C-alpha cells in the first residue's frame, strides 16, 4: 500500500465530482500514508471542515473499493507535508467559471519566509490602501459568488499556497473589489505587519512611468517585489501598455517564486483580455480562476436588507423584493438605488413603502423597463445562438432550437416583470406551464453544465449593459 492509493482516489474523484468542486476542495489536499492510516492535510480549517462534511463518505467508499478489509483509517489535519506531488488535471474549457492550470504541480509545502519568519523590511513605506470597511463578514454570499468568496477566504487564511495567483473575473459591480479588500484585511488580521498592497492596475502603470522619469526603476522593482501580497484590480487596463506588461511579467515571476500572494481581478476571463501578452495571460491562469456571476434574486434581497440594517433603516421585505426584482445587473446599482430611497425618506419624513419606492426610483425603473423587453431578449438570444427569431416562436422541438427558446423564456422571467402567461404568449402562444418548465430546466442545467451557466451569464451581462 503506497501513496498511489491516494492517486487512485484522486483519479476517481476527478471523474465523480464537478471540476469546480474538485479544483476548490480536493486538489489542495496533501496525503501521507503510514501505519495503515491515510492522513489528509488541508491548507486551513475552513477547507478541512468543508471536506470532512461534504466528501468524507466519498473518500471512505473509494478506500473500501480499492482495499476492502485492508482499507486504511482516515485522518484529517490542518497543515502541510514536505512533499511535491503532481496530478493530472482534466482539460478545462475557457467557459468554466473555475479553472486551475493543468501544468502546475500541487504545491504541497510552500516555504514562506515572508509570512512566517522574516522581520519587517523598513526600507520602504508601503501604501497598503486596503479598505478596512470591506471584510468577509459584510460580504453577502449567494450562489453567484459562493466559490469566489470561498477561494478568497482560503487565500486570506493561507496566502502563498495552492491558489496563487487567484484570478477573479466578472462584470462591473459584482463584488470583486470587495473581495480583494477582504483578503487584504484577512491577511493583516493574521499578521499585522504583513506588507499587503492593494491598487488599481493604472496605479502600477503610473508608478512605473514616474520611476522611469526619475531614474528610479530599481527602487520601483524592489518595492513591488518585496510585498507579501499584491492585490491588483482591473488588470485589463494593462492592455497595449507594453513596457508596463514587461515590468509586471518580471514582478509576477519574482513574487510567485517567493511564494508571495498575487490576486488579480478583471471584467473578463484571462485569455479573453485583448492587448495583453500571451505569456502574461498564461500566468494569470496558473493558480485558481473564479467567475463572479450577477446576483440572483435572493442574494439581491439579502444585499438590500443588509445595507439597510447597516444604515439603521427598517426595510420591509416586500419593498426589498420590489427593488431586487427590478434592478438586476449588479450590487453597485442596488446599493445606489437604496441610498437614493433612504435619502428621499430622510428628506421627506415618509415611510418606505412600495409606492414610495416607485416614486423615488421612477426614472431608474422606467429606464430598466425600457432597456429589457421580451422582444430585446428574443433578438439577443437568437443572435447569440445564431438562429432566427422565428425559430424561437415556432413549434420546432430540436435541441438546437428548444434550448435557446428555454433560455430566452428563463431570461424573460428573470429580467422582466411579465407574468408566466404573458411570457408564454410572447413565445408563440405557449402555455404558462411550458414557461415554468423552461425556467426550471435552465436552472437545473446551470447547476450541471458550465457551458449553460456561462451562456446564461453572458446573456444577462449583454441584456443588462
From Swiss-Prot:
Region (Domain I, interacts with DnaA modulators) residue spans: 1-84
Annotated region described as Domain IV, binds dsDNA, given as residue ranges: 346-465
Cited InterPro entries: AAA+_ATPase, Chromosome_initiator_DnaA, Chromosome_initiator_DnaA-like, Chromosome_initiator_DnaA_CS, DnaA_C, DnaA_dom, DnaA_N_dom, DnaA_N_sf
Keyword terms: ATP-binding, Cytoplasm, DNA replication, DNA-binding, Lipid-binding, Nucleotide-binding
Residues given in the record as ATP binding sites: 173, 175-177
Compartments reported by the entry: Cytoplasm
Family: Belongs to the DnaA family.
Subunit (UniProt): Oligomerizes as a right-handed, spiral filament on DNA at oriC.
Domain free text: Domain I is involved in oligomerization and binding regulators, domain II is flexibile and of varying length in different bacteria, domain III forms the AAA+ region, while domain IV binds dsDNA.
Function as written in the Swiss-Prot or TrEMBL entry: Plays an essential role in the initiation and regulation of chromosomal replication. ATP-DnaA binds to the origin of replication (oriC) to initiate formation of the DNA replication initiation complex once per cell cycle. Binds the DnaA box (a 9 base pair repeat at the origin) and separates the double-stranded (ds)DNA. Forms a right-handed helical filament on oriC DNA; dsDNA binds to the exterior of the filament while single-stranded (ss)DNA is stabiized in the filament's interior.
Protein name per UniProt: Chromosomal replication initiator protein DnaA
Species the sequence originates in: Pectobacterium atrosepticum (strain SCRI 1043 / ATCC BAA-672) (Erwinia carotovora subsp. atroseptica)
